[in-house]
Curated annotation (Swiss-Prot):
GO terms for cellular component: extracellular region. GO terms for molecular function: C-X-C chemokine binding. Residues 1-28 form the signal peptide. Keywords: Disulfide bond, Glycoprotein, Secreted, Signal. This is Evasin P1100.
Length: 96
């Protein structure tokens, strides 16, 4: 009787391990994404016509027309960039 219980428990553990491996391989091989990524709701980054520079006070010059300054590392010249698209970042101000 004791032999049958041990065999049953070993078989149960073996089935559980196979089940977990099967679940992992099915989810790891799936090609579908969890969120839709259509081009209708994507964000497009565009460079503006102006550059931005750092002044003697250590402050970057402002970009015009809804653009913001992008610079790399310790460079003193950057490019103005604008984001267009369907994005909804929360405002720090409370809604009225």
């Amino acid at each position: 009787m004791a032999f049958n219980v041990i065999t049953f428990l070993q078989f149960s553990v073996f089935v559980v391990i196979l089940f977990n491996i099967n679940l992992h391989s099915a989810s790891a091989g799936s090609k579908g994404s969890s969120a839709s990524q259509s081009s209708d709701n994507s964000v497009v980054a565009k460079f503006c016509d102006t550059n931005c520079t750092i002044n003697e006070g250590g402050k970057w010059t402002e970009c015009k027309g809804g653009c913001f300054c992008v610079h790399v590392g310790n460079e003193t010249v950057g490019r103005c960039m604008k984001l267009d698209g369907d994005y909804d970042y929360p405002s720090p101000k409370p809604e009225e």
